């Protein structure tokens, strides 16, 4: 999150007293989360309004709030750098100015695999692109890879994931996938789908590895754990409900077990998601081995930094 909010007026506009109050509330929410290190998507801002009882949880209200925020940003009343779209990103070739910059950035970004000495290997998978920033902020301090499924994972992506995870199993690590999704008919089923298809793609390769590692059942080597959104979390945090989509082919089974309401993962506070993810990561982690690996990495980083600081001497052949 950028340190200072960036207000830029492109289209002057005046607002009614009611909309002024909404804009003030938007800025208060954005500043609160910026201070904690988070930027928000439009949907996360909307759920903050719903959770605070400011608007009802209705599609029309989401559309209305989005229109007000859009006008307010153009009028220079809501900062441009506090609301993000995590689903659209520019891709291209990375550039540096010269070798000095390259070696300096290499030293800064140097990172070894801190899980290489662990008995387990953890990844965090989330249903929605919009939450990848929150998930990343929780995972990065622990050197945990994370992944946005974008709904049901494609066949290609899940097969590639299975092949990647098998490399960890081959290194004698048990793989744990921590999965987060909506509490609705499809969101609940996605956890099962990931587990089933990973098992399908990995099963033939896992048979010899299972024997080698002394396990009797292959599923113990790659495990998918759903950590959110679950019924106990709905009861504890009371996120705003949505009507279950009756057009979903899984709706009948879902309604028989959970009723006619469903809940979006986005409705949980980013801080709640952060704490939840980090708690589950730490449960699978050997803290002593992690600390040792981190110290070794920092020692190597220091050597690289010293090389970067004296790069011109090295490049010119100086002692």
Go through the PLM ranges and name each one.
Residues 184:
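Catalytic metal-binding/acid-base residues of hydrolase active sites
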């Amino acid at each position: 999150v950028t340190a200072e909010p960036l207000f830029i007026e492109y289209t002057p506009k005046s607002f009614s007293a009611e909309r002024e109050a909404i804009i003030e509330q938007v800025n208060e929410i954005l500043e609160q989360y910026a201070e904690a290190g988070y930027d928000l998507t439009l949907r996360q801002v909307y759920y903050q309004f719903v959770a605070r009882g400011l608007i009802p949880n209705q599609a029309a209200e989401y559309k209305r709030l989005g229109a007000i925020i859009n006008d307010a940003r153009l009028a220079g009343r809501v900062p441009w750098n506090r609301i993000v779209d995590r689903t659209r990103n520019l891709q291209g070739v990375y550039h540096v100015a010269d070798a000095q910059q390259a070696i300096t950035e290499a030293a800064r970004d140097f990172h070894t695999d801190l899980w290489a000495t662990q008995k387990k290997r953890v990844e965090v998978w989330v249903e929605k692109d919009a939450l990848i920033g929150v998930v990343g902020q929780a995972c990065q301090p622990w050197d945990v890879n994370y992944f946005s499924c974008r709904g049901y994972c494609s066949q290609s992506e899940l097969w590639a994931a299975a092949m990647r995870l098998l490399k960890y199993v081959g290194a004698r690590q048990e793989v744990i996938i921590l999965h987060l999704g909506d509490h609705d008919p499809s969101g609940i089923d996605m956890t099962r789908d990931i587990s089933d298809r990973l098992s399908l793609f990995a099963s033939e390769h896992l048979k010899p590895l299972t024997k080698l590692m002394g396990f009797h059942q292959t599923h113990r080597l790659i495990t998918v754990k759903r950590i959110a959104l679950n019924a106990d979390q709905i009861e504890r945090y009371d996120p705003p409900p949505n009507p279950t989509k009756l057009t979903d082919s899984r709706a009948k089974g879902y309604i028989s077990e959970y009723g006619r309401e469903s809940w979006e993962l986005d409705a949980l506070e980013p801080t709640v998601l952060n704490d939840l993810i980090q708690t589950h990561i730490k449960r699978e982690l050997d803290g002593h081995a992690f600390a040792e690996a981190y110290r070794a990495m920092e020692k190597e980083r220091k050597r690289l930094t010293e090389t970067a600081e004296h790069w011109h001497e090295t490049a010119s052949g100086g002692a």
